[in-house]
């Protein structure tokens, strides 16, 4: 009789996500979702609150921050509702998304900082708002990069 060897595994297990909302927000890498959303919200709100003097620069910042906010919100909802269990390559998708978003956010952060430097001599209140937007943009960049590495190594 021929021996029945089990075939090698050809798929990856879905990520082990803790059950419950509180447990989800307290474990790495999933704890990065809420700060990413909050600080990303502050970026596009602060940029939109100023007079957009440089539409090409700050338009890219608004596009990256708003799109990243919405897609990250969809990722969070998919973790909360368990949609990730249906896909085998969810961990790779999550890591690629957050890595790509970290790179795009870095470009947006540099452009926002440049727009802040240029606007220094104009309206002082808009300058301070641009400084805050630059700070939150760099902070959000760091969070997205940390999330990408932590989901990759998790």
Curated annotation (Swiss-Prot):
**Record-annotated membrane-spanning stretches:** 24-44, 61-81, 99-119, 131-151
Q: Which PROSITE patterns match?
A: MARVEL (PS51225)
Q: Which GO terms describe its cellular component?
A: clathrin-coated vesicle; cytoplasmic vesicle; Golgi membrane; membrane raft; plasma membrane
Question: Which parts of the sequence belong to the MARVEL domain?
Answer: 24-154
Q: Which UniProt keywords apply?
A: Membrane, Transmembrane, Transmembrane helix
Q: Carries keyword rRNA-binding?
A: no
Q: Which Pfam families match?
A: MARVEL (PF01284)
Q: How does it sit in the membrane?
A: Multi-pass membrane protein
Subcellular location per the Swiss-Prot or TrEMBL entry: Membrane
Q: Keyword check for Cell membrane, yes or no.
A: no
What family does the database annotate?
Answer: Belongs to the MAL family.
Q: What is this protein called?
A: MAL-like protein
Q: Which gene encodes it?
A: Mall
